[in-house]
């Protein structure tokens, strides 16, 4: 019996959307393992009998409760009416239309059906194509490298000392320029910088001047030199924009502090009670969290809006930036972000607009605001399995399935997939110092679709608890670097860049019930297929996997000697926290 109460579909968002200017993706949800087959019946609404087709739907993902199905449709006239035929094991079918469930198909094709009115090109969410090929590297500027001691702040401490909330070590833009060859050799092709604008703190999220690089980092001209040097190496550059709030030394806020309601900037901020003060630790004005030094900007004010849009415009036009990462993006009004996107895309249609949001973000990812968000839900899925070891492989696969079904495919393709940042405990620390477990998490990140980001120093084995210890100085002494881990990162980045299948959407998890901590999955495209096995257990495992392509020329990559390929199966002996990556060309393609 089909469990109708589990069936779900609606127009729009991640259920019925334009993937590109000629293709629609239609999705439906059913109870897990309850419906063996679904057909999508669709047609042209103004002549449905002449232009109609039946498309078998594919199970695109599953989680603990549901299966998610998808069909791609290219309507000849860009319009579509449709309904679903859900088939049971006994041959019966249920027909699902906008009006509900029926035991017979519609007598008239266009009555009571779901309706996609028209595929307007302007409505298609089209993230920049380059982001799908990008591998980001996050740099916390104050801690990456000190290339110019002449701009060190007063009281600068010796490089490599213990970080605190308020100390400085002299990292700057020249230090980044000096190490661009290192980043090129690592293989990354995009850099994301924490804030660079003038501020009082070491993290610079308390902006004092949005039009000026902080003097301890360098000058505006030095940033232009850095951007040009990155572009010459094929690297993109993303800067952090803090538009939710400013710093307490931002001149308009200083004016409000001094003049209260008489300040011409009084409406630039969200003041609940005058005069501005802090009562029992709570400011009388809205802030980021309850930080008195970070007053929240009123982006509904036309002057504030014009000022911030000019900031976004200036740095793209003058410096040639490739996009913005938007801090605390979910606390800024949607209308401002719509205008921001329009202005940024007018200047550079290929600019990447990335929002910092740590929860479900569908309202911001419909093509009118952000291209992507920082995918912290993905982060937590990986950390709970590989680092904290709170879940098993089946639960991991189910959580990934929920994520895949939660967004349109083009959003998933550019989702910012990170394993750590300046706001999290370091990956190696979460893995209890176990480098092999850290490798497994990184391996999945770099063989999964989306846009991976590496937090500076993770590749050499840097550790650190939560802020401020996760913001240590980059270790440049090679004798103190984990060079074997660095070689692993370089190898995996190279593998990802060489094989489009590892960046595409083809994904299937293969359950191995006798080994609950063994994660096995396939990645593929039209030309090649990968089988990847990750043993997230402190004991060796021996596993036999039926070959997805019997007779295919499967080969291990990266020199793993642990897998034996036979005609109908693949046998692997994996050491504790070991892995195997196998590759085969699709039949009929060149190897």
Swiss-Prot record:
The active site is at residues 327, 356. The keyword Hydrolase applies. It catalyses: cyclomaltodextrin + H2O = linear maltodextrin. The record marks 423 as: Transition state stabilizer. The keyword Calcium applies. CDD domains: AmyAc_CMD (cd11338), E_set_CDase_PDE_N (cd02857). Hydrolyzes cyclodextrins. Can also act on linear maltodextrins, with the exception of maltose. Monomer. This is Cyclomaltodextrinase. It comes from Lysinibacillus sphaericus (Bacillus sphaericus). The lineage of its organism: Bacteria, Bacillati, Bacillota, Bacilli, Bacillales.
